[in-house]
Amino acid sequence: MSELKALSYINGEWLDANHVKEDIINPYSGEMIGTSYLASSEDIEQALSIAQQAKKQLAAISALERSTLLTKAAALLEEQKEHFAKLISLELGKPLKNTRDEVSRSIETLAQSAEEANRLIGETIPGNVSSRGQRAMAMTFKVPVGVVLAITPFNAPLNLICHKIGPAFAAGNAIILKPAPQTSAVATAFVKLLLEAGFPEKSLQLVIGGVDAGRQLVTDERTNLVSFTGGAVGGEHISNSAGLKKVLLELGGNGATIVHHDADIEQAASLCAKTGFSNSGQSCISVQRIYVHKQIMSSFTETLKQKVEQLVVGDPLSSESDIGCMVDEQAAKRVEAWIQEAEKMGAELLSGGQRNGASITPAILLNPPKQAKVVCEEVFGPVVSILPYEELDEAIKEANDSRYGLQAGVFTNQLDVALHAAKELETGGVVINGTSNFRLDHWPYGGIKRSGIGREGPRFAIEEMTETKMVVLPNGL
């Protein structure tokens, strides 16, 4: 693969001349693999101006045409599937096993968005339920919000862009995309694909930059909705800075999975091993806390340890690797420090936890205290903690004792146990006989507490990215 370039795309032009540069580093090898050209404040001002001008043009494009363009983009991505999988692995350090899956999911997300473009329906509401409106009638229509600002993270750099651009374009909005700096080459390549698919030149502005660029975009009154996926601290800043504009926030998690005494231990251990360490644990729904009934504690722990130690840690570009590396060495050092803190507080390190550059071997901690960061904060790294319980309600209480509430999992063969846990767990989603880390892209995805506001999934995001306009006929037809 040739040297990577990450470029802003503003007003129909790719910008690189006279811009501040940053090296793109392969996190696994530490080698420079390309250059990122950062947008200036003046570039961002132009992006805002062009998006503001383009929103009426976008709203005027028919639903059929928007659907057709999204379908074509999905087809092009299918043709370039392996190229994008390797690009994500190269820039992020995510194994090909995972990146191939991410590209497949991205194709589905675009296709689902194309379908939703044709479902922007309103309703007719009779007035005769009121004594004042016996002849009156109201009709509702879905109209675009205007300019959608999409701010995306590094951990799923293609699919989470699709989750914002797909619904936003399907609804007829102009879009400004600000991807994570760590994976801006993936975003650049994807915008090129959208243009190849026929997206109007000024429908989409791509801004390469960091926190300052994001702040300028969020606070400007010309953006009508901010769709942000990232950490809770960043989401809180955005919510406080956005004023009265709409915000759609998919934030952090502290994924808890309960393994009850009647669970299938082999199934539970296999899924916890797979979903606790996928993408080096860099997922907001990654399994982090595993509450295990004391009756099966020993058996589950040994089975999980065996499964985890079978995972292959290695080159992300190798099809044999199950785990690559973290996004950078700084992130790996933080996770290493959290593991060491848990050990000092009394936890037993059963396996893994050794760092080499940006890579950390999958770590299993036994019974860390609830005050340890690996329990009470979002680890966002390859670490799971096993915590014993005696009564189901005790496990539910501990799982709920978190500032986050994204997803949870429950393993049990009793329907009443499953339904009780699903009702009582304070999360946006509960997976039965699965872990917290399971999502299909058309489902309503999001959390409560510090895990976010609103729901993603094309059908549900479109609800956020449109307004309901009412037309009233006081005297009927």
Give residue spans per PLM region:
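A short hydrophobic/small-residue beta-strand
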Residues: A174-I176, L349, G429
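Hydrophobic face of amphipathic alpha-helices that form TPR/SEL1-like repeat modules
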Residues: M1-Y28, M465
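N-terminal Rossmann NAD(P)-binding subdomain characteristic of aldehyde/semialdehyde dehydrogenases
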Residues: A59, L70-C162, F199, N475
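Short, well-ordered beta-strand elements within core beta-sheets of diverse protein domains
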Residues: I33-A39, A54-A60, L149-A150, T257-H260, ...
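ALDH superfamily catalytic-core signature
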Residues: V233-P369, L392, I432
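Conserved C-terminal structural/oligomerization subdomain of aldehyde/semialdehyde dehydrogenase
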Residues: S29-G34, I258, V312, I339, ...
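N-terminal alpha-helical segment of soluble enzymes
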Residues: Y28-P95, Q295, K307
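Rossmann-like NAD(P) dinucleotide-binding subdomain of oxidoreductase/dehydrogenase enzymes
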Residues: P126-Q267, Y389
